[in-house]
């Protein structure tokens, strides 16, 4: 009987941009399995990873999207398009008791309004706080509420319009106006690609490795997205593995995967947290330095001996490393 080689999985840290955009390597695989696994994983992570998104927006005094707002530069359609792009960190436990949550901006400031000015009533965290919403010339001229739910994939505004009509009596609000449905893009994965490469073409037994790259919107780590995609595939395949007992399997296979509440803390020891220039970051990675703990004991001479690090880059690293230490003195 043919023996199968042990398969290894690793993250390609040299090509890592940050923990939300990176690539992975899986090898050795039997010939043909690279494309089989890669295609299945790619389709799954792009379409089936659960998340949350805005499905409805209420703007004070607005009954339809073609109404004009005084003292606001943008029209209602533009504001709606901006608001539906606000992304929240998804925690399934938050939505287990209540499937609809509210976030709002109640006109407490004038000037340029960003996603960071929006307050979540349920403690949901906004992962793109620098997203521009609108420019307001008068305090109180713009007030709005976002209604958020969980789901998968893409839901168009026509479908959400029906959903709004179904749940309208459940939507608690502090302002007057109509709830306007918007498109909902629940997928936290922005991009996923794969490549199957032969790794021993000189051998009579041809094997492959799978290179899989993935980029998320910041609401989930790339590694977690890949893990969830694999678990979803395994759950479906497990149903087929025991054909004698298909009707005995529980639907729990397809429940939401629990996500850690504080993803940014896992980011804290990565050199990405120093916010270095691309040149400095790449030079450190090529020298096999990936964590702050790896470089904090290096001297200036040690840094200058690292290939492709000039004086300005060394100075930048040392200054930002010192700033990082000062900011995190009390967190040990």
From Swiss-Prot:
Catalytic activity from the UniProt record: RNA(n) + a ribonucleoside 5'-triphosphate = RNA(n+1) + diphosphate
Keyword Transferase appears in the UniProt entry: yes
Region (Alpha N-terminal domain (alpha-NTD)): 1-244
InterPro entries: DNA-dir_RNA_pol_insert, DNA-dir_RNA_pol_RpoA/D/Rpb3, DNA-dir_RpoA, RBP11-like, RNAP_asu_C, RNApol_insert_sf
UniProt KW keywords: DNA-directed RNA polymerase, Nucleotidyltransferase, Transcription, Transferase
Gene Ontology molecular functions: DNA binding; DNA-directed RNA polymerase activity; protein dimerization activity
Uppermost EC category: transferase
Gene Ontology biological process terms, A to Z: DNA-templated transcription
GO CC annotation: cytoplasm; DNA-directed RNA polymerase complex
Domain of life: Bacteria
CDD domains in alphabetical order: RNAP_alpha_NTD (cd06928)
Gene3D superfamilies per the UniProt record, alphabetical: 5' to 3' exonuclease, C-terminal subdomain, DNA-directed RNA polymerase, insert domain, RNA polymerase, RBP11-like subunit
Pfam families per record: RNA_pol_A_bac (PF01000), RNA_pol_A_CTD (PF03118), RNA_pol_L (PF01193)
Annotated region (Alpha C-terminal domain (alpha-CTD)), positions in chain: 259-332
KW Nucleotidyltransferase (keyword) present: yes
Family: Belongs to the RNA polymerase alpha chain family.
Subunit structure: Homodimer. The RNAP catalytic core consists of 2 alpha, 1 beta, 1 beta' and 1 omega subunit. When a sigma factor is associated with the core the holoenzyme is formed, which can initiate transcription.
Domain notes from UniProt: The N-terminal domain is essential for RNAP assembly and basal transcription, whereas the C-terminal domain is involved in interaction with transcriptional regulators and with upstream promoter elements.
Annotated function: DNA-dependent RNA polymerase catalyzes the transcription of DNA into RNA using the four ribonucleoside triphosphates as substrates.
Stated name of the protein: DNA-directed RNA polymerase subunit alpha
Organism: Mesomycoplasma hyopneumoniae (strain J / ATCC 25934 / NCTC 10110) (Mycoplasma hyopneumoniae)
Lineage: Bacteria, Bacillati, Mycoplasmatota, Mycoplasmoidales, Metamycoplasmataceae
